[in-house]
């Protein structure tokens, strides 16, 4: 494991982008894998932050695409210094306006992807590596129209 990487999900905007900005200054990192659905925004990150950036377009609510990312991690066999699980979303609406598919997708991204990526990455993490899971205050402050979130 000569290569050291960071993986940032939900990297195309907001907090994810800010994590990429900070990590791009880390001299010990060989690559920063930026994972999100929007290919154009991922390419913009590569243009803005340089050659360390490896854009990976995946929808992590999809189990097949999560497994594809797992295969990439296994194939690379790099030391993972940081896993930043930042991807997530919520649809704010009345519960009866939320489809079963939308509910399952939200659960898959906000919960299943976080658990899966942690399990995929741990075998490649050394002592001193970090997993950062970005979550919501919604569990402490429930709000109307955020039933699944």
Predicted ranges, named:
Residues 118-119:
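A short, exposed helix-loop element centered on a Lys and neighboring polar residues
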Residues 12-13:
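Conserved glycine-rich cofactor-binding loop
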Residues 86-91:
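Conserved NAD(P)H cofactor-binding loop of Rossmann-fold oxidoreductase domains
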Residues 136:
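Residue(s) in the substrate-gating loop at a strand-loop-helix junction
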Residues 49-64:
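Rossmann-fold cofactor-recognition segment
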Residues 94-95, 102-107:
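Substrate-binding pocket helix/loop in short-chain dehydrogenase/reductase
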Residues 24-44:
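Conserved glycine-rich Rossmann-like NAD(P)H-binding loop of the short-chain dehydrogenase/reductase
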């Amino acid at each position: 494991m000569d290569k050291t990487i960071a993986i940032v999900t939900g990297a195309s905007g907001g907090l994810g982008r800010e994590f990429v900005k900070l990590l791009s200054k880390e001299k010990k990192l060989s690559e920063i894998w930026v994972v999100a659905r929007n290919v154009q925004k991922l390419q913009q990150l590569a243009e803005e932050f340089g050659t360390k950036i490896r854009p990976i377009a995946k929808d992590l609510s999809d189990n097949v695409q999560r497994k594809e990312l797992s295969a990439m991690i296994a194939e690379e066999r790099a030391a993972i210094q940081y896993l930043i699980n930042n991807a997530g979303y919520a649809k704010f609406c009345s519960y009866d306006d939320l489809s079963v598919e939308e509910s399952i997708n939200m659960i898959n991204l906000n919960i299943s992807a976080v658990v899966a990526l942690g399990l995929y990455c741990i075998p490649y993490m050394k002592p001193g590596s970090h997993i950062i899971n970005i979550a919501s205050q919604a569990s402490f402050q429930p709000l109307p129209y955020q039933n699944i979130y």
